[in-house]
Regions:
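Binuclear metal-dependent phosphoesterase catalytic core
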Residues: 118-158
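Acidic, His/Gly-enriched loop-helix segments that form or flank divalent-metal centers
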Residues: 2, 6-124, 128-135
Length: 158
């Protein structure tokens, strides 16, 4: 869901391009997918970090603003949308999140990085790659706030 199937298919296509014999391909694929699964399963649901004396929370979808960070439910961290980015959260932290393609948040329906203009402590970075050709990969350097963008159309043209 939400791009996971496409990711797995891209991995399969990559492995097929290596021109492995079928039995070798199957072994390599199974080992790779098992390692990928274990890696993803063991990732934290959120990361707290401090960069240049500014506290950040990196989270897939967001948090329940009515709960403490330690009291969040896994489903909320992975699936919440509007209630998170439309609500006030701990103003001493900046929340960087994905999951919701920015064309559904930005007033201009772009995939550009979204900055919360009401509470000033949320940054959306989901450039909508799961939506196809219009999408882009958004990255932010937390040291200086510089934004880097790689548009899907530019990758396909290369």
């Amino acid at each position: 869901q939400n791009g996971g199937e496409k990711t797995i298919e891209n991995i399969r296509q990559y492995l097929r391009k290596k021109k492995l014999y079928h039995c070798d391909y199957t072994i390599v694929r199974n080992i790779f997918l098992r390692n990928l699964y274990n890696y993803l399963k063991n990732l934290p649901l959120y990361i707290e970090l401090n960069v240049n004396n500014k506290d950040y929370i990196l989270v897939h979808a967001g948090i329940d603003p009515e709960r403490t960070l330690d009291d969040q439910e896994e489903d909320t961290l992975l699936w919440i949308r509007d209630y998170f980015f439309l609500s006030e959260c701990d103003l001493n932290k900046t929340y960087i999140f994905g999951h919701t393609p920015l064309c559904f948040i930005n007033r201009d329906q772009s995939f550009n990085v979204w900055y919360d203009d009401e509470f000033h402590n949320k940054i959306g970075i989901d450039g909508g790659l799961a939506l196809g050709e219009r999408g882009q990969l958004n990255c932010i350097c937390l040291d200086d706030g510089q934004v880097f963008v790689l548009k899907m159309s530019e990758v396909n043209d290369a």
